[in-house]
C-alpha cells in the first residue's frame, strides 16, 4: 500500500490540475433561453454539396467553379450559406443560426466563412484585403445574393426573437479589433447572441472587457486534422488547455470527437455547456440532444421530415 500511495497522490494531483485547466464558467443566465433552440449552420441554406468543396488552392478559383453545374441544374432556388436569404429562412422557421464574421480592410463586418472568397463566389479575393465597396461586386454561388454585413443580418433575428451564434474569424493579430467591432455592432440591436471562436484570444478579450456576453471555445480534434497548427498548438486546442485563461461558458466541439476526455471533463463532470457541430442528419441531432448538447445542423430541416439536399438539390422522400 505504501508503494501505491505516492502514485495515487501524483495521479490525483494531475487530475486536479487537468480539471483546473479545462474548467468552464458556469451558470450564465442566458442558457435557459439558448437551450430552447436548434441552430442552422450558416443559416438555413439550400445549396449543392459541391459548394463545400475547396479549390486546390483556396485563394485561386476553379474555372468553372465546382458548384456551377449543380447550381445550374438545381430544381429549387439555391439559398447560399451565410446569405440573407438563408438567414431569413432560418429566422422565419423559428431556428437560431450560426454565422461567421471577418473584418474587412475598412473595418466592416463581413458575414462569410472563408477569408478567401474563391470557394463561395468563384472569384479571387481576400476579405481582409477588400473594402466594403469592393464586396458589392461579389455574388454567392452564382446567385443574386451578396455577401451581407453583420448589421444587415441582425434585424432578421431581432424581429424573430431567435438567437444567433456569432463566430469571430481572426486574421493575424486583429483579434481585438474584430471582436470589439462585433460587440459594438451587437450592442446596436436587440438580437439575442452568443460569441464563439477558435481563437482563444477572442474569448480572453471578452472575459476582460465584456464578461456579460456568453462566450464559447470552438475546437475539434486537431491531432487528426492539423489545419496548419504547430504540434504544441494542436495539443492545447484539442484538449482545451487554454480554458483556464478564458473560462468559456460553452465548448463548441466537432460532433465526431465529442468523447475526448477534456470535453467530457469540461462539459460533463465540471458542468460546462456544449454545442456539437456540424450535424447533418436528424439521427445525429437527436443523439446530441439526448446527451444534453445543443446542435448546429445543416443539409436537412429538423422538422420531423428530414429534407436532405444532394446533387442537384433533389429532395429526399419524406
Model-based region annotation:
Residues 2-318:
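Phosphate-group recognition and catalysis centered on beta-loop-alpha active-site segments
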Amino acid at each position: 500500500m505504501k508503494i501505491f500511495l505516492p502514485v495515487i497522490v501524483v495521479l490525483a494531483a494531475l487530475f486536479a490540475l487537468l480539471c483546473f485547466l479545462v474548467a468552464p464558467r458556469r451558470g450564465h443566465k442566458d442558457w435557459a433561453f439558448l437551450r430552447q433552440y436548434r441552430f442552422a449552420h450558416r443559416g438555413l441554406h439550400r445549396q449543392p454539396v459541391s459548394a463545400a468543396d475547396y479549390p486546390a488552392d483556396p485563394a485561386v478559383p476553379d474555372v468553372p467553379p465546382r458548384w456551377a453545374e449543380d447550381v445550374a441544374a438545381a430544381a429549387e432556388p439555391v439559398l447560399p450559406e451565410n446569405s440573407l436569404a438563408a438567414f431569413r429562412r432560418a429566422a422565419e422557421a423559428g431556428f437560431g443560426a450560426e454565422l461567421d464574421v471577418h473584418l474587412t480592410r475598412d473595418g466592416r463586418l463581413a458575414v462569410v466563412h472563408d477569408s478567401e472568397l474563391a470557394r463561395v463566389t468563384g472569384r479571387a479575393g481576400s476579405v481582409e484585403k477588400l473594402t466594403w465597396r469592393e464586396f458589392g461586386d461579389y455574388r454567392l454561388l452564382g446567385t443574386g445574393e451578396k455577401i451581407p454585413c453583420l448589421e444587415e443580418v441582425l434585424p432578421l433575428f431581432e424581429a424573430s426573437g431567435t438567437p444567433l451564434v456569432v463566430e469571430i474569424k481572426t486574421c493575424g493579430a486583429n483579434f481585438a479589433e474584430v471582436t470589439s467591432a462585433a460587440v459594438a455592432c451587437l450592442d446596436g440591436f436587440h438580437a439575442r447572441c452568443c460569441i464563439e471562436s477558435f481563437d482563444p484570444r477572442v474569448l480572453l478579450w471578452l472575459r476582460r472587457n465584456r464578461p456579460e456576453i456568453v462566450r464559447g471555445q470552438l475546437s475539434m480534434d486537431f491531432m487528426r486534422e492539423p489545419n496548419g497548427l504547430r504540434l504544441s498548438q494542436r495539443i492545447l486546442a484539442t484538449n482545451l488547455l487554454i480554458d483556464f485563461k478564458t473560462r468559456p461558458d460553452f465548448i463548441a466541439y466537432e460532433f465526431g470527437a465529442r468523447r475526448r476526455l477534456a470535453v467530457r471533463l469540461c462539459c460533463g463532470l465540471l458542468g460546462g455547456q456544449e454545442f456539437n457541430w456540424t450535424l447533418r442528419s436528424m439521427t445525429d441531432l437527436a443523439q446530441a440532444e439526448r446527451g444534453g448538447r445543443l446542435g448546429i445542423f445543416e443539409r436537412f430541416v429538423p422538422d420531423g421530415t428530414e429534407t436532405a439536399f444532394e446533387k442537384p438539390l433533389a429532395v429526399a422522400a419524406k
